[in-house]
């Protein structure tokens, strides 16, 4: 994301990144979906991490030990039971992240983009909510609703369906990210 590193290829971290680690990063966002990851604009002093679902919860603090020192860490995933479970697990691994677009208000705003199919196009089914100690009260409320299907039409809203401009506006306005948001310079990844 950072302009200084924007011309470099994406990095895949398979061993702890301790040498030549970035020292000027003030903002980090962990993204669940590759399309959204690729649509994120350049942002000074920021890094975008493709969490790739539950993969982010397994070894992120081992692979990126400096991540917890970044002052502003955001997680944005699918609005479904798995996405919220991933958020909970990230926090319980020691990542002090704030979520965006993962609460009941966001669900109601983007419900029109919902689906009843999982990532493999198989029908979603309701489930019994599990403990999620890393969620806030509002996030837990949405998690339970998405598990049980109570008073909602869809069990899943994919992250990539939400306009990227809406997310970057939230990052700018609510989390003070230095993102330029003039006109239509930020691509909209809502292509489905």
Predicted regions and their residues:
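Active-site glycine-centered loops adjacent to acidic/histidine catalytic or metal-binding residues
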Residues: 78
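Nucleic-acid enzyme cleavage-core boundary/entry regions
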Residues: 1-72, 82, 88-101, 105-192
């Amino acid at each position: 994301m950072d302009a200084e590193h924007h011309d470099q290829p994406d990095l895949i971290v398979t061993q702890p990144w301790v040498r030549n680690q970035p020292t000027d990063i003030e903002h980090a966002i962990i993204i669940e979906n590759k399309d959204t990851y690729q649509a994120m604009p350049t942002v000074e002093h920021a890094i975008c991490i493709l969490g790739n679902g539950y993969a982010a919860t397994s070894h992120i603090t081992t692979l990126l030990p400096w991540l917890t020192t970044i002052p502003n860490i955001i997680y944005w995933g699918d609005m479904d039971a798995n996405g919220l479970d991933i958020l909970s697990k990230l926090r319980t691994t020691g990542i002090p992240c704030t979520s965006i677009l993962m609460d009941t208000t966001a669900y109601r705003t983007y419900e029109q983009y919902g689906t009843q199919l999982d990532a493999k196009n198989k029908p979603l089914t309701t489930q019994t909510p599990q403990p999620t100690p890393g969620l806030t009260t509002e996030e837990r409320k949405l998690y339970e609703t998405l598990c049980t299907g109570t008073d909602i039409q869809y069990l899943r809203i994919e992250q990539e369906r939400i306009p990227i401009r809406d997310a970057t506006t939230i990052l700018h306005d609510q989390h003070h990210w230095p993102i330029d948001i003039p006109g239509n310079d930020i691509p909209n990844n809502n292509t489905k």
